[in-house]
Structure formats: structure tokens, C-alpha cells
């Protein structure tokens, strides 16, 4: 029984990438795209949204 190989889009350039162990840089298509993505995180171009611990308009507590 053969399984079909899943194809995903590279997050950086949108090229098709086979999702399999032989795809060295998955989900990226290449080391270049992987490093571009890493650089975006390092320069804070990408951010994970965070919720404020205090209501809007209220001054945050100081320690």
C-alpha cells in the first residue's frame, strides 16, 4: 500500500515542497528560505501577539 506524499507551500516563497523525511528544510524549500524566515523573527518583523495583563488605559504596575 503506497501513501500519497503531502505537498505544502514554502512559507517564504510559496514554492511546492514535498512533506517527507528527505525534504531537508521542510516546511521550507531551501536553506535560503529557512534563513530568510529566521531573519524575520530575529529582526522582530514577526511577532507572537500577547495579551495585556492590565486593562487598556490603566497604568501597568511597577515593581
Curated annotation (Swiss-Prot):
One of its GO terms (molecular function) is DNA topoisomerase type II (double strand cut, ATP-hydrolyzing) inhibitor activity. Keywords: Metal-binding, Zinc. Inhibits all the catalytic activities of DNA gyrase by preventing its interaction with DNA. Acts by binding directly to the C-terminal domain of GyrB, which probably disrupts DNA binding by the gyrase. One of its GO terms (biological process) is regulation of DNA-templated transcription. Belongs to the DNA gyrase inhibitor YacG family. Binds 1 zinc ion. Zn(2+) binds at residues 10, 13, 29, 33. Interacts with GyrB. It comes from Chromobacterium violaceum (strain ATCC 12472 / DSM 30191 / JCM 1249 / CCUG 213 / NBRC 12614 / NCIMB 9131 / NCTC 9757 / MK). The lineage of its organism: Bacteria, Pseudomonadati, Pseudomonadota, Betaproteobacteria, Neisseriales. Its cofactor is Zn(2+). It comes from the Bacteria. It holds the Pfam family YacG. Signal peptide: none annotated. This is DNA gyrase inhibitor YacG.
